[in-house]
């Protein structure tokens, strides 16, 4: 028991330190529209200031729509399982996991959406203006509400599964963690190739989702420990 408590305490200490460290790292090393953002966005703009991948089928239809629809389907299943657990006895034991996975993920996604709706940061494709010879960046552009990256959140919210299963099924937990990181990054990168976001937009999305999960997990850790005990 004491060993388990020490492990949980260490887990939270490490994650709080990482959250604070990464917060300042993003502010200092990855400022929105900073050198790294500009360096990584340049390859996707032609000489006239046009993002040539903006209407690319694979990036727009496959990444922006189909992949998101698949992830949405996964969460519809979790919601369905949670609802079914009130009627189906064999699902009752997993009700907490199903509900936590769905509702905490939705809170994380909704928070990103709320921050984005209130943001003054424009999308890269709204910041580029053609000139007679080339193009210029307008960093005063305010329309767009593009920070943080909303699309990437659909991938990053899968990281919630890491917290759901870390005590009972570590392999499944790491599957969700790795899948969430990879999907969030890839979905965000594809949007960057289209000119919809800077890299920093998506990195902040990942940070917000992780912070939300740490907050909820801190509050709910005792319930997860209880769920583990009753299944043993």
Role assignments for model-derived ranges:
Residues 66-82, 151-161:
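Hydrophobic alpha-helical transmembrane segments
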Residues 20-24, 69, 73-74, 101-110, ...:
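Alpha-helical transmembrane spans of integral membrane proteins, capturing the lipid-embedded, hydrophobic core
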Residues 2-78, 117-119, 125-129, 133-134:
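N-terminal transmembrane-helix/juxtamembrane module of multi-pass inner/ER membrane proteins
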Residues 80-104, 169-185:
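Cytoplasmic juxtamembrane regions at transmembrane-helix boundaries
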Residues 92-170:
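Membrane-interface loops
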Residues 2-12, 90-91, 227-232:
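Membrane-interfacial, low-structure loops and terminal tails that flank and connect transmembrane helices
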Residues 29-30, 37, 79-83, 111, ...:
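Alpha-helical membrane-inserting segments
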Residues 12, 17, 23, 137-232:
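Membrane-embedded catalytic cores of phosphoryl/pyrophosphoryl-handling enzymes
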């Amino acid at each position: 028991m004491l060993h388990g408590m020490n492990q949980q305490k260490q887990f939270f200490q490490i994650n709080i330190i990482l959250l604070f460290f990464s917060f300042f790292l993003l502010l200092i090393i990855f400022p929105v529209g900073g050198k790294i953002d500009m360096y990584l966005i340049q390859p996707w703009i032609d000489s006239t200031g046009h993002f040539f991948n903006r209407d690319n089928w694979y990036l727009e239809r496959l990444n922006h729509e189909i992949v998101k629809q698949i992830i949405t389907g996964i969460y519809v299943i979790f919601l369905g399982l949670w609802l079914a657990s009130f009627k189906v006895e064999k699902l009752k034991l997993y009700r907490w996991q199903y509900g936590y996975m769905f509702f905490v993920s939705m809170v994380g996604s909704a928070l990103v959406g709320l921050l984005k709706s209130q943001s003054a940061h424009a999308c890269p494709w709204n910041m580029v203006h053609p000139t007679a010879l080339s193009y210029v960046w307008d960093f005063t552009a305010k329309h767009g509400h593009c920070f943080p990256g909303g699309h990437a959140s659909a991938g990053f919210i899968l990281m919630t599964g890491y917290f759901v299963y870390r005590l009972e099924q570590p392999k499944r937990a790491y599957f969700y963690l790795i899948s969430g990181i990879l999907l969030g990054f890839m979905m965000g990168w594809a949007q960057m190739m289209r000119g919809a976001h800077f890299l920093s937009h998506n990195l902040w999305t990942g940070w917000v989702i992780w912070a939300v999960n740490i907050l909820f997990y801190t509050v709910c850790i005792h319930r997860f420990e209880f769920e583990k005990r009753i299944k043993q």
